[in-house]
């Protein structure tokens, strides 16, 4: 049995896709289209993409065909829906290959899963959109376990990895991010008050790990700690996730210590420092 993962919610038409000063408008639009196709985990109709982008069908089609010529997207099925192309995978994979991140981390993830008995995730910080993205996972052997797709995005304010990243930002940066992103309520336990969230982040900094207490999905808990690069900047996070029935109040501190230790081990193996 797999614990439920929150369903995707609809997007507003992209009034927010207007480029910031200095950006190339067509490039920004094309990259957003590619991102939306990737998030669909399948294929998307032209009309749906145009609606999400707030663009005419003709403009959307022109952007897509340009990316198709470069191999970033492709058309599939009889209806000609749009899906991610192989070249997007090649480009994206270079992030991991550049420092062989997964080869370093995966054995540590597996050991952490064995020691904790729960599913362990590796997430990286998407600096451009300030979201946590799962790039590796080792699932536990329990019948009831947490499951999330590789490439899945985690909300910064309502996930273990996200709050671990947020805790490393200044109060001004957090305030700015919350102003842009808002505080969506995924469950009744989601921290939707900026004051309460900032208090939670202060506790995270003090103890060294974040704690998601059913804030993203009911019945699930998660602890997470950041991994740092050679510039002392957090770029990834390890997390342990599982059902409340096993991650009891008594186990949270124990698992928190485990994830801190593992994150420090990855930081050192990666050549980073804290």
From Swiss-Prot:
InterPro entries: GAF-like_dom_sf, HTH_MetabolicPath_Reg, Tscrpt_reg_IclR_C, Tscrpt_reg_IclR_N, WH-like_DNA-bd_sf, WH_DNA-bd_sf. It holds the Pfam family IclR_C. GO terms for molecular function: DNA binding; DNA-binding transcription factor activity. Residues 46-65 bind DNA. GO terms for biological process: glyoxylate cycle; negative regulation of DNA-templated transcription. Residues 24-86 form the HTH iclR-type domain. This is Acetate operon repressor. It comes from Salmonella typhimurium (strain LT2 / SGSC1412 / ATCC 700720).
């Amino acid at each position: 049995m797999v614990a439920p993962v929150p369903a995707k919610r609809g997007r507003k038409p992209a009034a927010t896709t207007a480029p910031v000063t200095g950006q190339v408008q067509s490039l920004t639009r094309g990259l957003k289209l590619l991102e939306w196709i990737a998030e669909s985990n399948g294929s998307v109709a032209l009309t749906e993409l145009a609606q999400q982008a707030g663009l005419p069908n003709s403009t959307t089609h022109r952007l897509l065909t340009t990316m198709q010529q470069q191999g970033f997207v492709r058309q599939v099925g009889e209806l000609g829906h749009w899906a991610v192309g192989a070249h997007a995978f090649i480009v994206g994979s270079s992030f991991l290959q550049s420092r062989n991140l997964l080869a370093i981390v995966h054995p540590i993830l597996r050991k952490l899963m064995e020691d904790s008995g729960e599913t362990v995730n590796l997430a990286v910080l998407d600096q451009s959109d300030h979201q946590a993205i799962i790039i590796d996972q080792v699932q536990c052997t329990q019948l009831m376990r947490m499951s999330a797709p590789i490439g899945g995005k985690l909300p910064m304010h309502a996930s273990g990895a996200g709050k671990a990243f947020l805790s490393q930002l200044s109060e001004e940066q957090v305030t700015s991010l919350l102003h842009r992103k808002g505080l969506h309520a995924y469950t009744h336990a989601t921290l939707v008050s900026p004051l309460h969230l900032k208090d939670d982040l202060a506790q995270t900094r003090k103890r060294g790990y974040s704690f998601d207490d059913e804030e993203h999905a009911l019945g699930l808990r998660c602890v997470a700690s950041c991994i740092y690069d050679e510039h002392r900047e957090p770029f990834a996070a390890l997390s342990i996730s599982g059902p409340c029935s096993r991650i009891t109040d008594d186990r949270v501190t124990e698992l928190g210590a485990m994830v801190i230790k593992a994150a420090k081990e990855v930081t050192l193996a990666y050549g980073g420092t804290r």
